[in-house]
Amino acid sequence: MQLPPHPTSSRLPVESRISCDRTHLRYDICSISGPNVLDPTTSTFFATGPTSPTRSVLVEKIRPYPRKFEGLVMSQIKDLILTSGPQRPSCKVHHKVPALVFSAGGYTGNFFHDFNDGLIPLFITVDTIFPDRDFVIVVAEAPDWWPSKYAELLHMFTKHPIITLENEISTHCFPYAKIGLVTHGFMTVNQTLIPNSKTLTHFRDILGKAYGHQNQHPSSNTNHTRSRPRLVLACRQNAAGRSILNRDKVIRMIKRVGFDVVIFEPNANTSLRKSYKLIHSSHVLVGVHGAALTHSLFLRPGSVFLQVIPIGVEWAADAFFGRVARGLNLEYLEYRIGIEESSLVEKYGRDNALLKDPFSLQKNGWPTEIMNIYLKKQNVKLDLVRFKGYLKEAYRKAKKLMQKET
């Protein structure tokens, strides 16, 4: 994709042309190819460069959040306006580099969606459009905590300060602007659609630079001198649904198999640097399907990732985490619970279609009422005998990793 040149005094003024690509299922993306001014109080970009005298005033609206296919959440995303109209505010803050604008509204605050709908699309967009990393992030609808929580990672993409739209009152001028984020699908970086054949492993490398200790191999960490591999059990804190009802018994069994166990209950205030250090230096991550398993991005190659899959979420479990694990060269195991291990059996009975044939209820989509049953009303009581076999396999793979790193 060819970018417009930065305007200089030796060049003719760059025409400010507004264009939008609305051909994609998951996202729209718009451009202002020349000088423009942002009025944050109205969420409007004004094209300020010369325009063709035969071209009428153009107004485009975009909701720059990459879930265009999901009408309900998109209805909650604010429109940004792009216009070539004649009434243009004066500029207070001048930038020599372009703007990349997107929304951190929608599902932001859910750790999975922070990555799936925000940070991974940001990686794709930056590598596709701004490979020199010389641009300003302008983020709309960001919660107050968002810029600080992800500051270390955001500064892997750009050295310039982040502009949060709702906290600004001054107008900002840019040589050109891109509005929207490119996504390749759920937790996906498609190497055929991105320059230099980048993949999710390159995104993981950026996570390591942001949160890890550079030039330190995990085996040099004192935690890896131990004889027992470390297993991190990700648990849902004060959450409705997908809890392990016999957690204490499971933990005792994990220890008997030969692991040291760390209970990981992340929340909105959990330090990403501390989380990265814990997960990256451990040998196994285990958890019931849910947002916390997004931390599997922090695992190093060869680590074991064991996902416990409740009834009815098989497709999501593979699309969100299974394919990711295989692509990141993790030792991926999945434990699909049986009917008797689901708490739903007590309410609906083992012969109910919800338990016996969940695919028949989802063949035309995932209605909210069905999704809520599987995700919010279902807990798991693991079959200790059957689950022990998976733990033994995880232990074997973890010991193999330890031997490789010594």
Show which residues each predicted segment covers.
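The feature primarily captures lumenal catalytic ectodomains
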Residues: 1-406
